[in-house]
Amino acid sequence: VAFANAVGVINLHKKFPLDKSPEKPTNAAGQTYADLSLIYELNYTSTLSIEKAISKLLLSNILVYAEPHFIPKVTYSPNDPLANPTDQYHLQTINAFNAWNVNKGDSAIVIGITDTGNDPTHPDLFNNIKRNYNDIVDGLDNDGDGYTDNYLGWDLGMNDNDPTWQTNAHGVHVSGLSSASADNNLGGAGTGFHCKYLPVKIADANGSLIAAYEGIKYAADHGCQIINCSWGGGGASQYGQDIIDYATINKNCLVVCAAGNNNVDGDFFPAAYNYVLSVGNTTAIDTKQASSNYGYMVDVCAPGDNVNSTWPGSFYVTSSGTSMSSPVVAGAAGIVKNQFPSYNGLQVGERLKITAD
């Protein structure tokens, strides 16, 4: 392809080769479906800067947009392990116990955890993992989804069926806040109570989140009604918005995102994209946590300051950040979805916003 040769391309391929264009341009509400079948990934070796390479590509007049592949970062700082595994003040703060009197979620509701990986052996997580019984581990892609043996989730960072954490256990802590088994006489409780979770590892062996937005798509394609993103960075991209559009408009998911920990009134992505539920961080006395981002992009806030959750090796530790606040809300979203099954993802998010104090 001439436009690709102009920048010394060594690889050009469809990002999502199994995707097809939507049958209709919009949904019943008039919202435009995202067409991910048109997205290509390109690698080049020339000495051109990324800005000049993009300019040359756009001169072809056949591209809608061209942009770098932004790699976000996780959004927390961990503390030391605690001896008291029941120290979960956030449940009282958000009135989780009262909510559970009305609805305790259901195993049919699945929360996608796009993060650094899972601990499938943790006794407070193991039973709440969403299992794919259509693709048991036998070396075959039994369900034909393009992912062989994705029985317990998927590792997009390493492209294998083991989403266990490697260098950063951030995802283990996040998973417990939304999805730790409740009412099992062990450890703490996830806000989603009976809701399941799907581990989607988006980090490579070094902990770099190289497949963050691809993780959102994977979760949306594999039955998750709620998708948690406890990561992000500064830099908007059309690709990122396209993925959010796909998850929320095409697939009717709710995407819940950490607002960031820079104590600024400014954009942080994916939290600042359209159709996302952005979550800020509050303290044990229900005030803004010092590092939490704030401003127009924040939709709701939840406790995320020294909150206790699961950690590898059957441990529980406290950690802080909007990374912790986000899964608290994601679990609550699962409860709302189960209480109002006809709601699409955006409606679940609106319900959370209008009922927050």
Question: What spans do the regions from the language model cover?
Answer:
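Hydrolase catalytic cores
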Residues: 177-178, 198-205, 225-229, 304-357
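Extracellular/periplasmic catalytic domains that process cell-envelope and extracellular macromolecules
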Residues: 32-36, 58-59, 101-107, 190-193, ...
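Catalytic-core environment of secreted peptidases
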Residues: 189, 281-324
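Subtilisin-like serine protease catalytic core
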Residues: 97-209, 272-276, 285-287, 293-297, ...
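C-terminal subdomain of the subtilisin-like protease fold in secreted/lumenal serine endopeptidases
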Residues: 211-243, 253, 265-269, 275-278, ...
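Active-site glycine-centered loops adjacent to acidic/histidine catalytic or metal-binding residues
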Residues: 115, 260, 321
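Protease zymogen maturation seam
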Residues: 20-43, 52-110, 116-129
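Structural recognition of the beta-strand scaffold that forms the well-ordered cores
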Residues: 11-14, 40-43, 65-67, 110-114, ...
